[in-house]
Amino acid sequence: MQNIPQMLEITRAVVDAVKIPVTVKTRLGWDANNKIIVELAEQLQDCGIAALTIHGRTRAQMYTGEADWTLIGEVKNNPRMHIPIIGNGDVTTPQRCKECFDRYGVDAVMIGRASFGRPWIFKEMKHYLETGE
């Protein structure tokens, strides 16, 4: 995330080289002073990616602090964006999963560390999304 031109060049090259959909997973930015995801999302879409997954923390944060879904929602609600936006970060309960869909409008959520030792979390979330229970 410190060399965006190179990132975009590589992304374009991969999209052009393969016959399958290319997706990207990235973070909000490098650090709190460089949250560039709104602009970067548009640039990645222009490279021809099929979907974008956004982790709600910066690279500097790693896994500390809370994921900031505000910018994920901003990307999703950008009228220029037409690819699926997948949110990631701190989706640890079925209720939080539903909130991410309802509040931020994402097309999907990606579950990461919350599934470690809890592989049944996916079934729980699916059930909650379908029934509210």
Specify the residue positions occupied by each region the protein language model found:
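Flavin-dependent oxidoreductase catalytic cores
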Residues: M1-E133
